[in-house]
Amino acid sequence: MMNGSERHRLELRLGNQLIGHLEYDSQRDTFQLGYTPEWQARGFPLSPPLALDGSASSAQIRAYLGNLLPENRGLDHLIEALSVSRSNLFALIHGIGRDVSGAVTFTLPAEPDVPTRFRPITPEELLLRLEQPEIWPLEVWDGRPRLSVAGVQAKLN
């Protein structure tokens, strides 16, 4: 994902609708966020500092993205599951891009849509996770970070 080129891009989607894009310049370590003309005409900013006119600074975008990440052990589990560094904010956001708070997703351009799949959780598996969270964290299911499942805190919803 971050293999030598300077600019990296994620699409912002609300359902199936493309509403904008996030760009990261790895040489300058800066972010840019822009909305599609259609979204600018009838949508709303993702956050008050992320204005529809695209004037948000890299620091404002970085702060917004950082707030999408879990804290403490949740972040540690995410970093471990994705095998990326704590400072690689772009890779972290891409890694949880389909599972961030809210309805907007962050995906690579032309990344295929993966339908949501549900699976039953047995009482035994749930008990194991509650009794041994250091081995079976609530934030990782089936080898993937699942942040919205646990509310990114060591609790069950």
Model-derived features with residue positions:
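Phosphate/dinucleotide-binding and metal-coordinating scaffold of catalytic cores
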Residues: 1-157
